[in-house]
From Swiss-Prot:
Cofactor notes: Binds 1 Ca(2+) ion.
A GO term for molecular function: phospholipase A2 activity
Tissues where this protein is expressed: Expressed by the venom gland.
Lineage top rank: taxon: Eukaryota
Subcellular location, record wording: Secreted
GO biological process, one term: phospholipid metabolic process
Keywords, alphabetical: Calcium, Disulfide bond, Hydrolase, Lipid degradation, Lipid metabolism, Metal-binding, Secreted
Family named by the database record: Belongs to the phospholipase A2 family. Group I subfamily.
InterPro entries: PLipase_A2_dom_sf
Name of the protein: Phospholipase A2 pseudexin C chain
Described purpose of this protein according to its UniProt entry: PLA2 catalyzes the calcium-dependent hydrolysis of the 2-acyl groups in 3-sn-phosphoglycerides.
Length: 28
């Protein structure tokens, strides 16, 4: 689901760190 993925990506951005290190760091 692209909407869930998009929300997870937005929540996964912890500042200046690379996004791909936080693929399972999304909102739960």
């Amino acid at each position: 689901n692209l909407i869930q993925l998009s929300n997870m990506i937005k929540c996964a951005i912890p500042g200046s760190r690379p996004l791909f290190q936080y693929t399972d760091y999304g909102c739960y």
